[in-house]
Amino acid sequence: MSSNTVAQFATELKMPANVLLEQLRAAGVDLKSVDDAVTDSDKAKLLESLRRAHGATEGKKITLTRRQTSEIRQADATGRSRTIQVEVRKKRVFVKRDPAELAAEQAAARAEEAAAEAVPAEAAPAPAEPVRAEPAVETAAKPVEPPVAEAPAEPVAAPAAEPQPEQPAQAEAQPEPTPAAQAEPEPQPEPQPEAAPAQAVAEPVEPAKNVSVTETEAEQARPEPVVHAQTELTSQTPTPVAQPSAPAESPKSVKAEPAAAPKTTAKPGEIRRAAAPAAPDRAREEARRAAEAEAAALREMLSRPRKVLRAPEPEPQAGALSGTLHKPAGKPATTAAPKKDAKPGAPGAKKTIKTAEVSSTWSDDSARKKPADNKPAVATRDGWRAGGKGGRGGRNSRNQHQDRRHEQVQQEFIAREIHVPETISVADLAHKMSVKAAEVIKQLMKLGQMVTINQVLDQETAMIVVQEFGHTAIAAKLDDPEAFLDETAAVTEAEAEPRAPVVTVMGHVDHGKTSLLDYIRRAKVASGEAGGITQHIGAYHVETGRGVVTFLDTPGHEAFTAMRARGAKATDIVILVVAADDGVMPQTREAIHHAKAGGVPLVVAVNKIDKPEANPERVKQELVAEEVVPEEYGGDVPFVPVSAKTGAGIDDLLENVLLQAEILELKAPIEAPAKGLVIEARLDKGRGPVATILVQSGTLKRGDVVLAGASFGRVRAMLDENGKQIQTAGPSIPVEIQGLTEVPAAGDELMVLSDERKAREIALFRQGKFRDVKLARQQAANLESMFDNLGEGTQTLALIVKTDVQGSQEALVSSLTKLSTDEVRVQVVHAAVGGISESDVNLAIASNAVVIGFNVRAEQSAKKLAETNGIDLRYYNIIYDAVDEVKAAMSGMLAPEKREEVIGLVEVREVYTISRIGTVAGCMVLDGVVRRDSQVRLLRNNVVQWTGHLDSLRRFKDDVKEVKSGFDCGLTLRGNNDLQLGDQLEVFEIKEIARTL
């Protein structure tokens, strides 16, 4: 028995403990304080007390429910047989009689019995007497019930033999009243709590008992009615009385007990004498009215339709009908006995059979059901199953079978929710709606679409079709296998342990980031980079006196914005390197924005303090303007002056970095599947796809199945930043892994999966998704550019870019695409990691593109193919050079700019008109020079009158090419004779000037 204290119980109930203690004391539980223990019996007493206090009574109804599940097989729309689950639910409610009402009825019954004893002995054996003594019969049923429950197979009339030895002489003289009178004193007038189930059973039994009484009254005019009734009732007794679901059979068995006792001793003449009516007319009328009312109520209850889903039953065989229901062959005795003894025309017999059979018990129901057959249930027009071989109309069974074969199966329409994916075929859509594909095609034809069964429909069309069929259409996405990753991440939880900080060095180009990192690593990396600038993101881990620190070195050039953003995303602390002689530059500002967007703390390293022109104070002022406030100004950003050449301030810088790391309390699980970030990726000629990974949590082991973006694979080899083979890598350790199927994109998340098949599935899904998005973007770009280029002569410079690593490819493509203008557009046809191959050259031939190799070279076969077809191959190892040359090539493709240049001024001094030539002007060159092919502008009073070309230029009678200032000449204008004295001619030329970007 569970127990707890009053205080704990009050906490569970969310109420004050002292109030609960008062209620327990009021309920009769002797408790002193809130620390006393409360048992389950105390809780029951409290509940009973509270119910009485609130006027609640015990439950008066008992509801019994039962479920039965069966299966039927039925053909669906496609002709395939499928199994349908059929569930039958039954409910029975039993009402408990009020004890006060029962006591009142028993008292009234005893008074009537006392009055009946005063009647002469001849009138005593009247069969109507039990009607007036209903409560006595009910109470007599209570002690009879336990022996019946112990031996349910015996007839119920057997226990009635117990009172016979006590008064055998009275049994001969008075057959019926003797057992009834003996049964009276046995039950207690106040029912005990144990008797409650018997009362509950007796209550619904009462109407059936009255019905049987009216039946006996109806048979009083017949010669031997009581004998028939006795045999009929005893034939019904094999059903156990103790079952609560047999409300109509138990009273008959109880009533049969007093009648069965005299059956062995009394003579037939005495039984006939007992059938004579002797009770007063008034009592009989009241009994008849009450019995008829209750019989009507019972008939109404039994005739009420039950809402039960049942498999269709086969038609009953001829000759197997009894009463109104078909009884199975397993229980023939219950229906055969009344037919032998009872007369066919006796109304009492009919009613008894109906009452006994309709008041179904659960055992009868289960026996009545036939086992489900494997054949599909074929429905006919009226909704009933067709008869079998032995059914009615056996002669026409062949015709019925043919009709059934041609008859369409009528199924009730069920509105479903149909999940429609982005694309679905007509056949699949029909299967989802459980209709034939021809119906869907017919519906689409009505909508104006001619389709075939395998044609793929888009989501919108499919949803319209679903709605036309009356179903509810729900737009559904394809199954996303990436949901598996969320489940995996939720399951794998391990204890977090301290890890090393990841520090990213950021800043403007040439401010000394890599040199600073070199001094920390005691290695020379900057000199190895082409042009002395960092073009790759480097990852190193350094062991200092205070622990391990992982450094990420990002490029400072503007082209590497995405790389810097990735560095800030993967990092814990950012070291912002600013040159003391240069100050804050554009990439410095960008690095500040990246750090703030990632919520990463900053440590400013003011570099190059060893230079004479260094001005650290100016750097501080400029950084304050960028909202980076040093600690000495009241901010939270440490400023450390350092020199990458002399090593001054390096220890202070590391001290500040590790101090920030301690404040952050960096932790990560170690004993867990690894997760990380792809820092850099490239295609190595001998090793295949190689990716630089920063492990962020867990432990990466050799042989693990990894998923990185749209690529997957098994880790075949792991190298540290020094090129040494390692077997495992913990959190904050950068490693280079081999074994991926293709080069992942830099910035992709890497994670270890247990199942290679699942990794392949997710990678293929991502590839398809990426391809769809890429095609959609290209299609959108093509449409936009098509309309933009319709009226303009836009030129396109096609490029194929091949680089050594993924990050450089991303940066170079981004820089080249930004060069596009309205007149010349840069189109990167293909960009990838690796050397220049024959396929790249073939693509360049098809698209008339220039191939750019960044830190890579072309294969020998690719070189020959390029020379043969005149394809331009260009190699670069510095990103500046590549961008500048592409810019120059684009400038050469630009249309030249036309400028007008005035070269001379001429004044008209004389005007001559010559018939064959027209108007000739005698002029003086005031300024500059006049050339024959020049254009002129006619000015009159400084207003432009005409613009055109010179037709001829002569000095004296000779044609000349030009006339210089201070000389006179004669000239004619092409297409214009409107010349007057004093007009001026402005001579000019249009020159084409090459444009630059």
Swiss-Prot record:
Q: List every stretch annotated G5.
A: 643-645
**Biased-composition ranges for Low complexity?**
116-185, 195-209, 256-280
Where does it mainly reside? cytoplasm
Tell me the segments the record calls region G2: 532-536
Q: Which portions of the sequence form the region G3?
A: 553-556
* NCBIfam families in alphabetical order: IF-2, small_GTP
Family, per entry: Belongs to the TRAFAC class translation factor GTPase superfamily. Classic translation factor GTPase family. IF-2 subfamily.
Q: What is this protein called?
A: Translation initiation factor IF-2
Lineage of origin: Bacteria, Pseudomonadati, Pseudomonadota, Betaproteobacteria, Burkholderiales
